[in-house]
Amino acid sequence: VGESGCGKTTTGRCVAGIEKLTDGNIYFDLPKTSMDVLEKAQAGKIARQENQEIEQINSSYDINKITGEAFNYYRKNCQMVFQDSFASLSPRQLVSDIISRPLRLHKICANDELLPKTIDLLEQVGLGREHLYRFPHQFSGGQRQRISIARALALDPKLIVLDEPTSALDVSVQARILNLLHNLQQQRSLAYLFITHNLSVARHMADNIIVMYFGKVVEAGKTEEVFSNPQHPYTKKLLAAAT
């Protein structure tokens, strides 16, 4: 969470591999043992012989350094849903093409399985067969966001980056989309990186929360702990402004 311009979306785009880092690392699906090694290195408590292990970790799990099968695995398992569903869906493509494209690119299923799989994805987000052969402009904002979510689900990812997915929607539609996302998370064991400036949405959706201010993380912790006992002055101001 954080105010507009604090770096939330840029961070999310970096995690999704859309933007390249100028410095630092982003690790995807990092094993606990490797995480322990990196934490020791950050604390300056690493032996010289472990430097090679860090290089191996970077080449295997850093999204800006992995190649080949490791990169394909990351691209398949990290998807993104954008704030502006109208701009993120091709106006020249039918819904059937938009949702089935990831399946074709990654060769997830045979050609004769594409249509049933696409219909199944639509039904999972509350749409149906009757929506297959329409263009994005023929849908409401909430329906377009459901299509974006269906596309993100197509490859059965482990992580979905959600960039303010409800901020452009009416309040009643927001609630339905949030409930849909919550249900999908439970059914599919999904992890979300949920970007928002709405603290009530963050509290409803998040297990852990990061507060950003001017491009920096100023506070992080369990959601209820941050809300009940904020430590940073900026976090306190955010919470005070929301009450």
Residue ranges and their predicted role:
Residues 16:
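Helix-to-loop junction immediately C-terminal to a conserved catalytic motif
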Residues 55, 113-130, 239:
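Conserved ABC ATPase "signature" region
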Residues 135-139, 143:
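Conserved ABC ATPase signature
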Residues 154-158:
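A short, proline-enriched helix->beta-strand linker immediately N-terminal to the Walker B motif
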Residues 202-204:
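A short, surface-exposed alpha-helical micro-motif characterized by mixed small hydrophobic
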Residues 220-221, 229:
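ABC ATPase "signature
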